[in-house]
Amino acid sequence: MARSSTTYPKRWNSPKTTVIRVPEIMAEDLLHIARRIDSNGGFRLREEANTLVLELMAARKVQYGSDRPVNVSSVPQRSPFRYPGGKTWLVPYIRDWLRSRYRQPNRLIEAFAGGAIVSLTAGFEGLTKHVIFCELDAEVAAVWRIVLNGQSEWLASKILNFDLTEANAREVLQGTSTELRERAFRCILRNRVQRGGIMAWGAGLVKSGENGRGINSRWYPETLARRIREINSLKDRFSFVEGDGFDLIREHQSDPDTAFYIDPPYTKAARRLYSAWDVDHRRLFEQLSRCKGDFLMSYDNTVEVVALAESFGFEYRAIAMKNTHHAKMTELLIGRNLRWLKG
């Protein structure tokens, strides 16, 4: 059961699937029930007088928890970017958070998108009706504008046909073209060949990389082209804003049917890693405290951030994850209500 505009898991489509028509007033509630069933271990129906009762069974055992890092290899990789501090590990939590709501949000706002893995997950998996994501960095924004605004095939072809050598890479990275398409390609190349995916200007090129492949160790042209094309094929589910995430939050803060995911440039190493790194964190907490809709933040696990969360009465929880060097560490999830968290 789904409306024609709704995306649902492919596993729901089988020879046993029956298509039914229901009044619009029932559609959202029925879709919510279906998603709840899909994320639980099972269900049973029983009759009581003139009432049909649906009982959800115990939730399936999940492969993550507050002290058990997510195996990121089990999570779909959808972004063309690789980021230090990327949020692929957070995807199962995002699913649980958005599915825990009684009604699906009208929109999800990701105010500091970067590689936008949360936005892409929500859009691809139909976790919200629409996704709006925002990025202040002009070079990263150039990529998203190209991917979503009709020139994705040019970028995919450029990546597929590029002869990656150190000399060719340096020529592109030292280029000064202000044309949007060229800036987008230069940004993708920079992200893929500079050490650690660091986006700040001046970072060195990869030297050894995977299996001694050097500069080619993170350059997978077929994969990058496929991801870009797949995102473009679903472009109607996304809106991209180049600008300040604070402005986007303010624009939608009075809407109770908007959910906000916030992953700002972190307080520890942001200046070294990113070009758009300077964020007023107290102002961010203040602005979210005024939002009518739900929100989820991911943050450094630091004394300063904990103090901010406590001062605004937000709940917080340390979540196990692994960094790019596979070292186990924790980050904070912060929200008004974290009772949906498992483990």
Residue ranges of predicted features:
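SAM-dependent nucleic-acid methyltransferase catalytic core
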Residues: R3, D67-L98, Y102-R103, A141, ...
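S-adenosyl-L-methionine
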Residues: T7, W12-K16, R35-F112, I117-V118, ...
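Long, positively charged, glycine-interspersed low-complexity recognition regions
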Residues: K16-T18, T267, Y274-G343
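Short active-site oxyanion
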Residues: T18, Q104-L108, T128-H130, K235-S239, ...
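Short amphipathic alpha-helix starts
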Residues: T18-A27
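Conserved S-adenosyl-L-methionine
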Residues: P23, Q104-L164, D263
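A short, Lys/Arg-enriched interface patch at domain edges and termini
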Residues: A27-R44, L338-G343
